[in-house]
Swiss-Prot record:
GO terms for cellular component: cytosolic large ribosomal subunit. Part of the 50S ribosomal subunit. GO terms for molecular function: rRNA binding; structural constituent of ribosome. It comes from Pseudarthrobacter chlorophenolicus (strain ATCC 700700 / DSM 12829 / CIP 107037 / JCM 12360 / KCTC 9906 / NCIMB 13794 / A6) (Arthrobacter chlorophenolicus). This is Large ribosomal subunit protein uL6. GO terms for biological process: cytoplasmic translation. InterPro entries: Ribosomal_uL6-like (IPR000702), Ribosomal_uL6-like_a/b-dom_sf (IPR036789), Ribosomal_uL6_a/b-dom (IPR020040), Ribosomal_uL6_bac-type (IPR019906), Ribosomal_uL6_CS (IPR002358).
Amino acid sequence: MSRIGRLPITVPAGVEVRVDGSVVSVKGSKGELSHTVASPIEVALDDTTLTVSRPNDERASRSLHGLTRTLIANMIQGVTAGYEKKLEIVGTGYRVQAKGSDLEFALGYSHPVSVSAPDGITFAVEGPTKLSVSGINKQQVGEVAANIRKLRKPDPYKGKGIRYAGEVIRRKVGKAGK
């Protein structure tokens, strides 16, 4: 049995979980999320405990077992505490500023680059070179942060670009000059 999948999920106080057939809905103080569970996997709710089980040991069932348990646990974490990714901008003249709910970047291109926040995502600019992406859906927060990082990936020679906070960039040695 899956080591992750067999762990029960405890539902904290203030979180409402509904299981309607194959749809699991989680509602908390920050919002509501739902997930459709794949067909061989079953989810059972007992008071404040969610258990995820599988009917057999086929490869597909085994792989979906731990995944489903983790996705539901992430939904519960999202509606209680939420998720946040912090980004840093490194480079001369590289900066970000908030324009309403959008972000406008100066990244060394001939034009400013603007990014709008999708539903459920909020941006916070903590300075001209620091920003954070937050929301209740872990996958969506990570995807938006990755798309922002993709605007100007960190350069392996000088380290300039957009990086996650705490990310270590593997630096390359430049060519040996005479």
